[in-house]
Amino acid sequence: MKTFNIKSPDQAIRQALIDRIDNLAKPEGSLGMLEELALQIGLIQQTLSPRLRNPHNIIFAADHGIADEGVSFSPKEVTWQVINNFLGGGAGINFLCRQHGFELVLVDGGIDFDFPEGLDIIDRKVRKGTRNYLYEAALTGEEMEQAVTAGAEVVSDCHHRGCNVVSFGEMGVANTSTSSMWMSFLTGIDLKDCVGAGSGLDSEGVRHKYNILKQAKENYKGNGSTEDVITYFGGLEMLMAVGGMLQAAELGMLIIVDGFIMTNCLLAASQFYPEVCDYAVFGHCGDESGHARLLEYMKAKPLLNLGLRLGEGSGAVCSYPIIVSAVSMINEMHTFAQAAVTKYF
């Protein structure tokens, strides 16, 4: 797999950041997670005056062979149909990006559809959907590497345009199934606790989904390494997000993590480079049943809990104003000395 140069942020500036935050005109710790965010972002950017520039939400999209087994509420063609809605500006993520000042980037990583030329979508299609991992490996090693590299290159392009904060979204019918497989293999959590309703399955649908994934897990004869798992049970859009997250960390960008699927992508990325988590903020806890368990496993503190299960980066983008508030706090609040206020604690 492509190699990255990721290091934890230098801690030499930590005490100066803490002193700056603690000397703002407020009781120490009274702004809670805003103070934690300001410290984290200051460490990432290595400055007492961090700035957020040109935020991007990148949506990687691809199809999944496992969708043929009826594990999703939606038929496979919904993937390309939703992309058309993104392109038309009428989807949930479109209004959120407009509201919060994000540039929306769409990437075809492996949709089983041929879009006409001239659309505002980046073509990095590795293949038209993955193979069905109930019966065979979803991807070859070469295809996995191609996807990771493509995701990294998309993020590099965003960085070159002045972006230093990025969120990731996805579109791909049945990708909650693939996420459940990653979660179970990479955490050791029982598969049953990793499988949920996805885009809207009823209890019978969830039972069928679990049985299919359980059989796929039993059929798997690989070595169980992270690289083997994310290849055999691969999702092209998910692997591109893995590469994108790792590249963002290498470039010192702030990563806003979305829901269940993107949290699994960070989990996979962290298996190779644990330091990637130092650059990540968890936007929200989604409504997919496995997400809360996964966040707990990763010792993550999500900023929001709104019952979202849309994907697309929606929860990450919704959380952005909180992140902006943290940066505004450290840059705009007066210290006790500036405010001529006695330090009262």
From Swiss-Prot:
GO terms for biological process: cobalamin biosynthetic process. GO terms for molecular function: nicotinate-nucleotide-dimethylbenzimidazole phosphoribosyltransferase activity. Its EC number is 2.4.2.21. Disulfide bonds: none annotated. Pathway: Nucleoside biosynthesis; alpha-ribazole biosynthesis; alpha-ribazole from 5,6-dimethylbenzimidazole: step 1/2. It catalyses: 5,6-dimethylbenzimidazole + nicotinate beta-D-ribonucleotide = alpha-ribazole 5'-phosphate + nicotinate + H(+). It is an enzyme of class 2 (transferase). Keywords: Cobalamin biosynthesis, Glycosyltransferase, Transferase. The keyword Transferase applies. The active site is at 312 (proton acceptor). Belongs to the CobT family. Catalyzes the synthesis of alpha-ribazole-5'-phosphate from nicotinate mononucleotide (NAMN) and 5,6-dimethylbenzimidazole (DMB). HAMAP family: CobT. NCBIfam families: cobT_DBIPRT (TIGR03160), PRK00105.1 (NF000996). This is Nicotinate-nucleotide--dimethylbenzimidazole phosphoribosyltransferase. It comes from Porphyromonas gingivalis (strain ATCC 33277 / DSM 20709 / CIP 103683 / JCM 12257 / NCTC 11834 / 2561).
